[in-house]
């Protein structure tokens, strides 16, 4: 269950919706009242939806899934990048490029191009066999690609789920996810249609503190899912469908020696996982 209280949500301003004249009637079920022309969101219902979203993300990751974090509005960029990086999940915090999901093969080629450019030494004019101008242009290309695609550089396949801040602004991302059958968890304000996502979280999607709180919470769900995934693999003595990456192992610093039996490793790993579980920021 998500570790969040009503007090946390109130302090973060998650109960403030948009002006009443800008509302979407489909959000009526999540609106408590209105004050000074502003809709007030029913945070009791928000808490229920948060728990559902949290459990979904945790379960998805525990079953070897990945979650793509998306938030390109100014208020969300830092939280999206920081929290996704914390649990080593892919993210998009700059402009969403059309086809990032539906044309993933082409996007992957651009990511590979980025990795190629990162291997170059742009200060070695003589060794590269290129002119200073050519190296400068290539370096600019690298910087541009990194800004656009750096967050998904390690995403080798389309994600299992997507977490979105502001589905109105990220309408294209949500649309692409739906075309591929990818479930979406999203912060949904009073001006949006909650029916367009599978796991809506009714809340203010403009307040920086609120965005940070919910994004951090979803990252915690990912971390919990990673620990559960590792624990299940050890208990059953089976390899995961996908090998654990180095960054996942770093989350488990108290991992038992590989040569120990599965029965002996499971209790020790459980203690280590509890001690190392990331805290909400």
Swiss-Prot record:
Low complexity bias (residue ranges): 255-275
Record flagged with keyword Amino-acid biosynthesis: no
UniProt KW Cell membrane keyword: no
Keyword entries, A-Z: Ribonucleoprotein, Ribosomal protein
GO biological process annotation, one example: translation
Family: Belongs to the universal ribosomal protein uS2 family.
Protein name: Small ribosomal subunit protein uS2
Source lineage: Bacteria, Bacillati, Actinomycetota, Actinomycetes, Bifidobacteriales
